[in-house]
C-alpha cells in the first residue's frame, strides 16, 4: 500500500498541534508483514501501512530483503500522535520498536536550519561607545556550528567494498545492531585532484551506551581485514540515507509494475496473433460445395 504524501511544510512546522498523519517505525523484525503491523496499529485508526524492502541482485538470482522500517498513515494527525505516545518502545515479534512522527526529508529546510545555527549576534557596545572596550567594538567571527549527531547510530566509513549487512551485524553483535544501511559515496580532498568511491554504512545500535562502547572497542579492530572509521552519525546523514532508501524502493516498485504491464501486453498480443492464425471451421455448405 502506498501512503499518501504528507504536507512537508506542516510536518516541519513548530506548532504544538501535529500536522502530519504519518508515523515512522524502525527496528522492525525482518519477517514482520504489513498485515501484522496494521493489526498492531489498528487501535488508533490506521489507514495504510508500508514496509519498504530492497531487491538484492546476485549473480544467479535476486532476493527481496526488508529494510527493517515502516510507515503508517492514520485517519487524523491526533491518531498518529496517540500511536507514537502509546506504542513507542513497545515490542512486536520480540523487537522493541522505535516510533516517531514522520518528517519528510527536505534539503532546503536542512540548509535553512544550518544557516540559522551559524548566525551569532554581534556584540553590542554600551550606551557610551567611547567607553566601550576595543574588543567589544569589533564583532568576533562566529564559531563553526557543530551539526547534531545521533545518540544510537554509528557511521562506518572506508568499509570493504564487498561488505554486506550480514558482516556488519556480526561485527556489532555485542551492541544490539538494529537498522543497517550500506551505501556507496564519493570521496574527495580539497586542493588535490583526488577522487574515489568508498563504501560506508549507518548502523543503529541498542542505545547511547552501546554507541559509545562500540566506537571505543571496535574503533581499533579490522573488518574483513581492513581498518575502518567509526564515529557518531550526523542526524542529517541518517535522514538522507533513510529517505534515499525509501525513494529507491519506490522507483524499483514502479519499474517492476511497468515490466509486469509490458509483459502482460506482450502476452495478450501473442495470444491475439495465435487466434488470428487458426483457420475457421468448415461449415456443412462448404463441405457440400467441395463435394
UniProtKB/Swiss-Prot annotation:
Keyword terms of this UniProt record: Repeat, RNA-binding, Transcription, Transcription regulation
InterPro entries, sorted: Euk_RNA-bind_prot, Nucleotide-bd_a/b_plait_sf, RBD_domain_sf, RRM_dom, Rrt5_RRM1, Rrt5_RRM2
Top-level lineage group: Eukaryota
First and last residue of the signal peptide: none
Region Disordered, annotated ranges: 109-151, 271-291
Matches recorded under Pfam families: RRM_1
Domain RRM: 21-104, 152-235
GO function terms (MF aspect): mRNA binding
PANTHER family, per database record: OS02G0815200 PROTEIN, RRM DOMAIN-CONTAINING PROTEIN
Family recorded in the similarity comment: Belongs to the RRT5 family.
Function: May be involved in the modulation of rDNA transcription.
Protein name in the entry: Regulator of rDNA transcription protein 5
Organism in which the protein naturally occurs: Lachancea thermotolerans (strain ATCC 56472 / CBS 6340 / NRRL Y-8284)
Organism lineage string: Eukaryota, Fungi, Dikarya, Ascomycota, Saccharomycotina
Name of the gene encoding the protein in the UniProt record: RRT5
Amino acid at each position: 500500500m502506498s501512503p499518501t504524501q504528507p504536507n512537508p511544510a506542516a510536518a516541519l512546522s513548530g506548532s504544538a498541534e501535529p500536522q502530519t498523519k504519518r508515523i515512522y517505525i524502525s527496528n522492525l523484525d525482518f519477517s514482520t508483514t504489513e498485515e501484522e503491523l496494521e493489526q498492531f496499529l489498528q487501535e488508533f485508526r490506521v489507514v495504510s501501512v508500508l514496509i519498504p524492502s530492497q531487491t538484492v541482485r546476485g549473480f544467479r538470482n535476486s532476493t527481496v530483503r526488508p529494510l527493517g522500517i515502516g510507515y503508517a498513515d492514520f485517519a487524523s494527525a491526533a491518531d498518529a500522535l496517540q500511536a507514537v505516545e502509546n506504542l513507542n518502545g513497545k515490542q512486536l515479534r520480540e523487537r522493541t520498536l522505535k516510533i516517531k512522527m514522520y518528517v519528510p526529508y527536505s534539503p532546503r529546510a536542512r540548509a535553512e536550519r544550518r544557516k540559522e545555527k551559524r548566525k551569532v549576534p554581534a556584540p553590542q557596545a554600551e550606551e557610551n561607545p567611547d567607553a566601550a572596550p576595543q574588543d567589544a567594538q569589533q564583532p568576533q567571527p562566529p564559531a563553526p556550528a557543530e551539526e547534531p549527531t545521533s545518540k544510537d547510530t554509528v557511521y562506518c566509513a572506508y568499509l570493504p567494498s564487498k561488505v554486506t549487512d550480514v558482516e556488519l551485524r556480526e561485527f556489532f553483535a555485542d551492541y544490539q545492531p538494529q537498522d543497517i544501511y550500506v551505501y556507496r559515496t564519493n570521496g574527495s580532498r580539497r586542493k588535490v585532484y583526488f577522487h574515489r568511491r568508498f563504501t560506508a554504512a549507518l548502523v543503529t545500535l541498542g542505545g547511547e551506551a552501546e554507541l559509545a562502547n562500540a566506537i571505543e572497542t571496535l574503533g581499533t579492530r579490522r573488518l574483513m581485514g581492513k581498518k575502518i572509521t567509526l564515529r557518531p552519525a550526523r542526524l542529517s546523514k541518517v535522514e538522507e540515507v533513510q529517505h534515499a532508501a525509501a525513494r529507491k524502493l519506490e522507483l524499483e516498485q514502479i519499474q517492476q509494475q511497468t515490466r509486469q504491464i509490458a509483459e502482460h501486453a506482450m502476452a495478450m498480443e501473442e495470444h491475439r496473433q495465435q487466434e488470428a492464425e487458426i483457420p475457421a471451421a468448415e461449415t456443412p455448405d462448404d463441405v457440400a460445395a467441395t463435394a
